[in-house]
């Protein structure tokens, strides 16, 4: 970013206008990442979108719609409120761009449901990859069923947009399709590595965190500096008595999950993951 600031804040003629409009990285957990690749646009014009259909019969994903209708389910208030589906890559594959999950669901015991979606890469023997913080490397999406109404003027096949103006509660026994947006990501798979899709009940994170309990060091003079330079630091926080006004504490949001969640696949229920596959050049 230094060249950007030099050009626009200091009027330095450094050729910034010739900088490519799109540069992206494609993560390859367990392999070598592709970094700073130049592209002409995003999403990429050469994208070949592919549907992977869910099958509750064997917890799999496949390129063809299963003929048999089957159901996956879990108890949303259990310790492991989730189901997973897997697809083993038949060749080296790049997935870069916007993803979407088209999912048929019902909530027999309630009138709403909050879902969390995760798309991640597993090794050939089904083990997850972790980043330096210990978290899995994944693309995620979240959806409240009652907020499923789409903005038809803005929605595309790959990118659903919601109106957020109409609450559509679920009726007893009602099976509805959800279009769930998944954050864009660049991910490389080698042959025989596994794409795993997880659908689970979303649990809101606690929002009432004690203010001031974390200790953090920041530059004393409040400026940025080059890595490796020695600067004076000041430590803030570390005292739980330094709390915010109790009236300003944000309470944790209430969950809209209760009882069983059902996911329908096959036959009339064409639940699928919509993937942006990038052909090799």
Regions found by a protein language model. Give the residues of each.
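Catalytic-core region of carbohydrate-active enzymes that cleave or remodel glycosidic bonds
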Residues: 1-9
